[in-house]
Amino acid sequence: MAEDLETMKPSQAPQQPSLPQGSSKTYRSAEHSQALLSGLVALRDSGILFDVVLKVEGKSIEAHRILLAASCDYFRGMFAGGLKEMDQREVQIHGVSYSAMCRIMDFIYTSDLALSVNNVQETLTAACQLQISEVIQFCCDFLVSWVDEENVLELYKLADIFHLNRLTEQLDTFVLKNFITFSQTQMYRQLPLDKVFSLLNSNRLEVASENEVYEGALLYHYTPEQLEKDQVSLLESPKLLEAVRFPLMDLAILQRLHDKLGLCPLKTTVLKALEYHKNESMQPVMQGPNTQLRSEFHCVVGFGGMYSAPYTVLSDQVKYLNPLLGEWRPLTAPHAPRMSNQGIAVLNNFVYLIGGDNNVRGYRAEARCWRYDPRHSRWFQIQSMQQPRADLSVCVLGDFLYAVAGRDYHDELKEVERYDPFTNTWEYVAPLQKQVHAHAAAALDGRMYVACGRRGNTYLKDTFCYDPERDQWASVALSPVRRAWHGMAALQEKIYLIGGSNDDEGFRQDVLEVACYSPKTDQWTLVSPLPAGHGEPGIAVLAKKIFVLGGRSHNQGDRTDYVHVYEAERDYWEDGPRLEDDISGMAACVLTLPRSVLMDTDVWTQEMYMQYMDPVQNLADNASEVMSVSDWEDLDNSGED
């Protein structure tokens, strides 16, 4: 055949296929690495090409030097780092048992590690010395799978000896999750004081109420029997009581504790907690470390709204998006107002619902206002506004709430009221430059931006900026699209206008264009449009994403249950978990909810929790609450309801 090729004429030689210039492609085999490892195992099993002998406890283990050097830093330094072992046929390994070394070698060759209660500690010791991180993690995972209240103390000691921070965190998770039962044991009292103090300070402590934290702090110094018989001296406050968030304890328990205490530092602490309870309207501006909810769960929460069926029924439901399950769940919140299209704002994890539409016997604008505290799942009615308002916007600037414009179904408004939680009063500030309703607002860098809306039958593009220090409004660049009954959100130094409707085509239609405003340049740009219409939506910002909840689609002619989520960094929309009902006028925000609310289900797993926590560690500081303007359609266009 070779001779035939040599005698072939140039015109008869195989031609190079004609391919486009610069054509290339890289292929990767999914099986190659496993086949390579299997080949090395075959060499080991056949005793072929061994070039080093490890001497462990006087016994020999033959191996391939190149594989050991590739497997971990310990052997890489030994065989490729210029040490004398590079040229030695036999190498002594000290401080490791022969049986543990055999298991390590099996792992290096096969990726499999056989662990048991009897061998895990010696395997962990060997893995730590040889610096094989995967084996260390497997050992830690195995130990955690067997942790209980009897052995957790020994495992803490083991983690401390080998500086296993991940194991320590996993043990902390076990204690925090089982704190109520574990704090009743003798093992609890044998933990170091600093460790217990750290656990009691944690937001991950699983307790039903702060009363249990107080009891847990005392149980470190006293037995359950002593607590039951009230054989406790609090003249010298135990250090652990500094971790108790007394303002979050039940008022009745605080009062009893105060009454029985003599003059001591603890009585002063309890008195301050009682003052917090008694100044209910001021609680949002009395916040500090000892009033923070014990939770790391930031959740999108929706309040109220109106269903499609039964006919124009107002909702008093509160729903939250469970981040562990990825689905909407009811939030237990008795005495919630039955309203729609309320202004909503969050101040220090207290949510305010301002005015709105009480459509019980025809449209009626509300002046009443409510506040919800997720710490105790309690509603509190604050002072009513001086004017009833529907189709309004609400923002928080500093410690104040601002209710902007709207209408009362007799007149459109331009007046702006400011709520002071220190005095529980409303006062007028500088009015908007024109009457408007069905607009939207958002706060950014200490200023409030109000955009679009409707005046009479005209849809607007106007955008205004309010400076609270000067109490002045200024016009800024016009929005590129007219709209009303839309949402607005601030994210990453920009403001987004989302959803709503207009009549630019001579009839009511959805606005799908999403506009983005930069205060630095005073310019609007259009970004990726909505996948579907959202009039009167709920809007909330969480983890650098904008959630758009339900609302009304004029193109479809009905209310909706779909949820869309916008990721600004990718300029991309994705579907979110659907609501349980078609609903419009839902007021939405982001709240930190108690762990007990989310953990009160037999569906979630520890794996779900860890998947949630990994990204949350990086995003917790960025979680923000942005008020939505989920506004009703005007009376003239309400016939379809």
Curated annotation (Swiss-Prot):
Short name of any one Pfam family annotated for the protein: BACK
Superkingdom, natural source: Eukaryota
Pathway noted in the entry: Protein modification; protein ubiquitination
Domain BTB: residue ranges: 50-117
InterPro entries for the chain: BACK (IPR011705), BTB-kelch_protein (IPR017096), BTB/POZ_dom (IPR000210), Kelch-typ_b-propeller (IPR015915), Kelch_1 (IPR006652), KLHL22_BACK (IPR030575), SKP1/BTB/POZ_sf (IPR011333)
One GO BP: mitotic sister chromatid segregation
Disordered as annotated region, ranges: 1-25
Biased composition (Low complexity): 10-24
Any one of the GO CC terms: centrosome
Compartments where located: Cytoplasm, Cytosol; Cytoplasm, Cytoskeleton, Microtubule organizing center, Centrosome; Cytoplasm, Cytoskeleton, Spindle; Nucleus
Statement: the UniProt record of this protein carries the keyword Repeat: yes
Keywords recorded for this protein, A-Z: Cell cycle, Cell division, Cytoplasm, Cytoskeleton, Kelch repeat, Lysosome, Mitosis, Nucleus, Repeat, Ubl conjugation pathway
Self-association and partners: Component of the BCR(KLHL22) E3 ubiquitin ligase complex, at least composed of cul3, klhl22 and rbx1.
PANTHER family: KELCH-LIKE PROTEIN 22, LD33804P
Function per UniProt: Substrate-specific adapter of a BCR (BTB-CUL3-RBX1) E3 ubiquitin ligase complex. The BCR(KLHL22) ubiquitin ligase complex could mediate the monoubiquitination of PLK1 and regulate its activity in spindle assembly checkpoint (SAC) and chromosome segregation. The BCR(KLHL22) ubiquitin ligase complex may also be responsible for the ubiquitin-dependent proteasomal degradation of DEPDC5 and the activation of the TORC1 pathway.
Protein name, entry field: Kelch-like protein 22
